[in-house]
Amino acid sequence: QAGKDIRVLADSFVASNAYASGNAGAIRIASHNLTVDGTGGQQLTQISSQAFYVSQGNAGSIDVNTSGALNLINGGKIVTDTNNIGHAGDIHVTAGSLLLDSRNHVGLTGIYSSNDFDSTGNGGAINIQVAGDAQILQSAQVSSATWGKGHAGDVVFRANNLEVNGRGLGVAAGISSEVAETSGGQGGSITVNVPGHLKIFDLGLISAAT
């Protein structure tokens, strides 16, 4: 918990992982502004909880509460996933404003929960509550996906105003729930509540796909 700002910068991370029979612990972050920025990094820049292949436990939940801005940019991510029989953790975000912007980064930027190819556990739910404006730009995503035998988690997204704009990299930006061809699981539902303006441009999308 910080009274002002928290910044997670290039090649830095906050992580709680499961490697054995126990569960990973929860991550709880409270600050005025939170920025996860992969600019200049060569590796992962993220807040994550993962249940790895050799483990039997569950990944932990991630709770982020910012009274000001939450910015995930240029490869910055919030991630939960599972590679085993355990489940991925849920992600809860409460923010004054939200910016997900991959800029020129070709890798993942955004908020993700998934189960991977060899897993039988379920992906976690994603719940995002933004008091003001939210932007999902270039190839950034809010994504719930299943690649294994488990189910993808549900996605709930609320913001006063939302812009989804895939301009720039030729890759879609948006909010999605995906079931891969290799998966035996079911996709999660998507609920989007925007009482103000909802703008979707270029390769922007809100999609539930199998």
Residue ranges and their predicted role:
Residues 1-210:
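Extracellular and secretory-pathway beta-repeat/beta-biased strand scaffolds
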